[in-house]
C-alpha cells in the first residue's frame, strides 16, 4: 500500500510539473524532457494505482526504458553546469530537469525487484529502444524542419551521404 501511494504521488507530481512547465509553451512538447517526464509520470501513476487496487506491478523493463531517457535528460542538465550551453532551471523546469529524474530513479531502485534478473537477457535489449526511437524521431524531424530539437549539432554534420 505504501509503495503504491508513493508511486502515485510522485507520478502525479511529474505530470503536474510537466503541465505547469509546458502548457504555456506547447512548441517545446517534442523535447526529451517533456516526453520522458510524461512517460515516467504516467508509468508511476498507473503502477501506483495497480499496486493499490490489485496488488500487481508493471514490468521493470518499462521502468528501465524510461530511466534511460530521464537520466539522459538529467546528465545533459548536469553538463549544462559547465557553461557550454544553457538549460532552463526556473520554476517547474527545475523539477523537470532535476527533481523528477531523481524521484523516478529512486522509485525504480526502491520498488522494482530486479534481483533475480539475469544480466544477459533478451528483455534487457528492450531497454534502449525508447531512447533510440526518440533519436530517430529527432533526426526525421530535422529532415523536415532543418533543425534538431536541442540544437547541439548542426544538421549538415549528421546527414547521410
What kind of region is each of these model predictions?
Residues 1-10:
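N-terminal membrane topogenic signal
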Residues 46-54, 73-87, 106-113:
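Membrane-helix exit/interface motif
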Residues 27-34, 59, 85-97, 118-123, ...:
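Non-cytosolic membrane-interface motifs at loop->transmembrane helix junctions
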Residues 144-161:
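Membrane-interface transmembrane-helix boundary segments in multi-pass integral membrane proteins
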Residues 18-26, 53, 77-87, 140-144:
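Juxtamembrane "helix-exit" motif on the non-cytosolic side of transmembrane helices
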Residues 11-18, 63-79:
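Small-polar-interrupted transmembrane alpha-helices in polytopic inner-membrane proteins
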Residues 10, 36-49, 99-111:
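Hydrophobic cores of alpha-helical transmembrane segments in multi-pass inner/ER membrane proteins
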Residues 52-62, 112-122:
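Membrane-interface helix-boundary motifs at transmembrane edges
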Amino acid at each position: 500500500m505504501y509503495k503504491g501511494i508513493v508511486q502515485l504521488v510522485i507520478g502525479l507530481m511529474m505530470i503536474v510539473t510537466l503541465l505547469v512547465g509546458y502548457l504555456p509553451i506547447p512548441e517545446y512538447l517534442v523535447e526529451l524532457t517533456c516526453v520522458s517526464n510524461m512517460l515516467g509520470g504516467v508509468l508511476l501513476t498507473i503502477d501506483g494505482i495497480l499496486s493499490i487496487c490489485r496488488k500487481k506491478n508493471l514490468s521493470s523493463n518499462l521502468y528501465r526504458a524510461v530511466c534511460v531517457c530521464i537520466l539522459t535528460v538529467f546528465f545533459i542538465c548536469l553538463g549544462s553546469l559547465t557553461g557550454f550551453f544553457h538549460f532552463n532551471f526556473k520554476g517547474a523546469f527545475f523539477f523537470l530537469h532535476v527533481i523528477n529524474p531523481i524521484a523516478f530513479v529512486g522509485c525504480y531502485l526502491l520498488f522494482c525487484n530486479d534481483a533475480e534478473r539475469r544480466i544477459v537477457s533478451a528483455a534487457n535489449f528492450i531497454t534502449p529502444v525508447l531512447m533510440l526511437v526518440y533519436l530517430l524521431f529527432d533526426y526525421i524531424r530535422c529532415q523536415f524542419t532543418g533543425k534538431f530539437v536541442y540544437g547541439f549539432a548542426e544538421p549538415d554534420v549528421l546527414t547521410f551521404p
